[in-house]
């Protein structure tokens, strides 16, 4: 979430200075700062296409003024994206069927791979052979989308390997998953959590908003058992596959919202999706939450504040502060970390570790 409502904070030092004052009622010790490289850090990029005089350009549009900016190079994008952008554009410019009613492109990379998604205002079935040729000639994993339709050439799944405390963690996911778009910072976030856990007495972990298992797989060795919840069926399927990739057997995934889990733990409602999981078998010493921008609602806060230790990863300092007002009634902030996910922008990712008073 952007800090631009509070000022033009772009550098990590400026963000740090603001956050120290903004959260001073909860935390007065030293913050841990995690910087990112300032170029080629972002693994996801979305661009529009601009058509003029029968040719094609990458473009971005200012959301307020609607002013158009022709894009030739993205210095923040992963090197694989930067290298592929001109090759793709040259190919599209030479194929009238492919460039007709093409309005957008999404690039996604991992350390190993790259995929692109082309977005159309027409029936992509009519250009299926052209799209297949593009995928084959440029040797690219390609997805094409138009209203109600999706075509996949080669594969839409990407493989990723993260290095966490001298361990390699293997993942597979696709473009529909929520992905931390700065791989180096993602590794630093997970490592920060692991370093905290190294000093803790641990039993079982409850994780909410687990996605495809980004944190879950890396934290599995620290706990006897993990219960991880997520509402996306696709994410759950990838999480299960990622357990197989890492030979991990102590994670139990449940396709439940956080609100539904709260009802289940309080025994106010039974869920068929929990039929193979005995909640009473878990002894949660820690909770990990990585919520969307809206933060945690009251039912989730009431649930997690029962447990001794809370790890809160936040993409929105404003909702984090609101949630801490409630959580600080029962817990104390022990560690606070700042992750410069998007360099030279007002965005900031925070990590907070709380323990019960």
UniProtKB/Swiss-Prot annotation:
GO terms for cellular component: cytosol. The keyword tRNA processing applies. InterPro entries: MeTrfase_TrmA_AS (IPR030390), SAM-dependent_MTases_sf (IPR029063), TrmA_MeTrfase (IPR011869), U5_MeTrfase_fam (IPR010280). One of its GO terms (biological process) is tRNA processing. PROSITE patterns: SAM_MT_RNA_M5U (PS51687), TRMA_1 (PS01230). The lineage of its organism: Bacteria, Pseudomonadati, Campylobacterota, Epsilonproteobacteria, Campylobacterales. Coiled coil: none annotated. GO terms for molecular function: rRNA binding; tRNA (uracil(54)-C5)-methyltransferase activity, S-adenosyl methionine-dependent; tRNA binding. Keywords: Methyltransferase, S-adenosyl-L-methionine, Transferase, tRNA processing. Its EC number is 2.1.1.-, 2.1.1.35. S-adenosyl-L-methionine binds at residues 180, 209, 214, 230, 290. Transmembrane segments: none annotated. It catalyses: uridine(54) in tRNA + S-adenosyl-L-methionine = 5-methyluridine(54) in tRNA + S-adenosyl-L-homocysteine + H(+); uridine(341) in tmRNA + S-adenosyl-L-methionine = 5-methyluridine(341) in tmRNA + S-adenosyl-L-homocysteine + H(+). The keyword Methyltransferase applies. This is tRNA/tmRNA (uracil-C(5))-methyltransferase. Dual-specificity methyltransferase that catalyzes the formation of 5-methyluridine at position 54 (m5U54) in all tRNAs, and that of position 341 (m5U341) in tmRNA (transfer-mRNA). It is an enzyme of class 2 (transferase).
